[in-house]
């Protein structure tokens, strides 16, 4: 199963929560002035240059409200679009289109923004041996979508959640007593398929983590020059 398939399978519960948060019992403004069963059309037009991301989420928002809504997509996921480009034509019940508009755009705009920024950084790293990774510092209930956007923009995902891998930070190391003890405990507890990553701040910690058998060394908040020095030890 691909990452995209997994994400799409798990997206509905979050999208439903977002719709419930915004609409609750009804869109009272729209229902005041729009008659029932009136068809309408919406043109989705790009406001600024960037990588488009989240088209399938945009579409799914409306589908969960009304499965008769139709979509004529003019661009593909991950395309670089320009201000003024027509990206999609959406046709359906006008009440549905107006009620779902904000939620659909919230997803599309946020995901496209992340994909665009990731794309800009990925271009700067082109030709190097550097992989651009994300973190777990995501917006609550948006992790699935934000991490997907990083991949669309040209980055890679680090841990998706706390069960994905062992990452020993300063708090874990402090509780264990040392990096060596923390790594040993992790090796005893975790499955052999889990890599053990250790966050370090000093040259001495880099050496200790390597000697302890850590699979990955994370250099925490270091300048490029300091990272070069630490890399030579590894």
Show which residues each predicted segment covers.
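Glycine-centered loop/turn positions within well-structured domains
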Residues: 225
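Conserved small/polar residues in nucleotide/adenosyl-binding loops
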Residues: 233-234
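Acidic/glycine-rich phosphate/pyrophosphate-binding loops and surrounding catalytic core
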Residues: 2-212, 216, 228
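Positively charged, low-complexity, intrinsically disordered RNA-binding extensions
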Residues: 222
């Amino acid at each position: 199963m691909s990452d995209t398939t997994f994400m799409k399978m798990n997206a509905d519960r979050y999208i439903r929560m977002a719709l419930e948060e915004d609409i609750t019992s009804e869109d009272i403004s729209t229902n005041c002035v729009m008659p029932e069963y009136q068809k309408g059309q919406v043109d989705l037009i790009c406001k600024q240059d960037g990588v488009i991301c989240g088209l399938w989420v945009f579409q799914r928002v409306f589908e969960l409200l009304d499965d008769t809504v139709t979509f004529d997509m003019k661009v593909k996921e991950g395309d670089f679009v320009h201000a003024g480009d027509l990206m999609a034509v959406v046709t359906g019940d006008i009440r549905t289109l107006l009620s779902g508009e904000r939620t659909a755009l919230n997803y599309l705009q946020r995901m496209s923004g992340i994909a665009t920024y990731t794309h800009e950084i990925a271009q700067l790293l082109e030709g190097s041996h550097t992989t651009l990774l994300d973190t777990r510092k995501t917006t609550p209930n948006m992790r699935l979508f934000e991490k997907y956007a990083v991949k669309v923009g040209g980055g890679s995902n680090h841990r998706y959640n706390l069960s994905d891998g062992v990452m020993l930070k300063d708090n874990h190391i402090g509780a264990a007593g040392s990096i060596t003890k923390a790594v040993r405990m992790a090796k005893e507890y975790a499955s052999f398929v889990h890599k053990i990553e250790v966050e370090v701040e000093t040259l001495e910690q880099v050496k200790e983590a390597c000697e302890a058998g850590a699979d990955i060394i994370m250099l925490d908040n270091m300048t490029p020059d300091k990272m070069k020095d630490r890399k030579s030890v590894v």
